Amino acid sequence: MSQDQPIVLDPTYASFDAAARPADLGATHFIGIGGAGMSVLAEMLHAEGVSVDGSDRSHSAKTDRLETLGITVEFGQRAENVAQAETVVYSSAIKPDNPEIVAAHAAGKRIVHRSDILALLMNGKRAVTVAGAHGKTTTSSMLSHILVNAGADPSYAIGGFIQGPDGTTLDGGHAGKGDILVAEADESDGSFAKYHPTIAIITNCEADHLDHYGDEAHYRAAFVAHAGRATGHVIISIDDPDGLAVLEAMPADVKSHTVAYGTTARESLPDLGGAAYVWIASESETAGSGVEQLTLHLPAAVTAGEPVSQSVALKVPGVHNARNAAAAISAAVLLGVSPADAAKAAGTFLGAARRFQVRGTVKQVTVVDDYAHHPTEIAALLDAARRRYPDSTIRVIFQPHLFSRTKFFAHQFAESLAKADDVIITGIFPAREKQADFPDISPSTIVDAAAGLKDASAGTWIQPVEDMCLAAKMMAMRAHHGDVIFTVGAGDITDMDQVLLTALEAHRESCE
């Protein structure tokens, strides 16, 4: 990168070839090291023996963990933080005017996107990528859990924690001694174009990230291209029309090593052009049982032998998790795990952190946290909630993520949230965006859309409350014995759970 040229950060530019290895990086500095994806990669490089440090704006559970591993984290982003680095890593949240980017550019240092680091870690491994609008973290976590239980000791790079027993959490990054690497492939900025996985899982192709892709056609085309880069198999959900459209657009040679999956019986599907098919025969959760029963009909293309009908009992609720299990189990079997062992391990999986995660109960009011931030994810969450808690009032505190997503999907959010009984919508989490660029978008945008629904939201109380603490207190005052309150969103609403539990205790007379 010439020091005389303007700084352009292009996440789709590939910085390394297939021969590159972590040792080639030299001392490596991460800007925003506490981010979900960045912290995992920093930890994995550290485990590979690379000298790693980083900076972030504030302390978090992620930065605390990195420091316990011996990784230096500076708080505040300043030019001097990159002085000793040979390689500087940024994410799509980092702008060209960041002082550490400016200093690294002026010094002629190597500046790479976080996806370059993940691509580098894949070199020499049997890599499994998980891309898609929904289900990436759960599917990659479940697959990693299955492989760990099978004794494979995989490496994995997952943008979140994994739920462990007794309310504990396991870190989403691990540098294993085996030859398998499981990773989320973030499609939001197009950077997954750098990956050439052995197995490419595509969980869902519903439109999202239109701020980057412009329209649905370009978004779907990116998944078609991603499938074409897989060196082994493609595993893709075709329960949604967009997934089926992506499959149909694949070249014949890609379809020939593709495994589609879904809940529709094979005889009711159109011609799949040579792709194999895993049918998910869901027996559904017995209301309130906490177990999702299903049978996976695995074809010979997956088992490398005779077709197998494998029963699975999941502890994670909802049809969407049955789909996630189909993808994870299919990939595990393709990697050499027996169907029975894969199903048994999947049945002990408790979920990724912030996915239907129970945070506590006060006076028989249960608080559950979930990362859902797209209308389809919210609809799936609330459907699962009705199955898990059939006799409860379902209340939701929702923090929208991104002004652009709120603008694009306001009506769809309103329709999904109408599945709840009570809804409070808090201030929008901006992430990389600025309110000034979206002056007319606010929590009321979704509330106004809900008011325009004819029947769907007739029984749902929905209000905008900008301040999350106030929202928690208001919802606590509305709660009653047996209710379930969900905190929902991809932003910092997860930090409100303790506030909500405290508010419920303070207003415990409402819960009795």
Curated annotation (Swiss-Prot):
Keyword Cytoplasm: yes
Entry keyword set: ATP-binding, Cell cycle, Cell division, Cell shape, Cell wall biogenesis/degradation, Cytoplasm, Ligase, Nucleotide-binding, Peptidoglycan synthesis
Residues the entry annotates as binding ATP: 132-138
One term under GO cellular component: cytoplasm
Pathway terms, separated by semicolons: Cell wall biogenesis; peptidoglycan biosynthesis
Enzyme class: ligase
A molecular function (GO) term: UDP-N-acetylmuramate-L-alanine ligase activity
Biological processes per GO annotation: cell division; cell wall organization; peptidoglycan biosynthetic process; regulation of cell shape
Protein EC: 6.3.2.8
Gene3D superfamilies associated with the record: Mur ligase, C-terminal domain, Mur-like, catalytic domain, NAD(P)-binding Rossmann-like Domain
Cellular localization per UniProt: Cytoplasm
Parts of the chain that traverse the membrane: none
Reactions accelerated catalytically: UDP-N-acetyl-alpha-D-muramate + L-alanine + ATP = UDP-N-acetyl-alpha-D-muramoyl-L-alanine + ADP + phosphate + H(+)
Pfam families reported in the protein's UniProt record: Mur_ligase, Mur_ligase_C, Mur_ligase_M
Protein family membership: Belongs to the MurCDEF family.
Purpose of the protein: Cell wall formation.
Annotated protein name in UniProt: UDP-N-acetylmuramate--L-alanine ligase
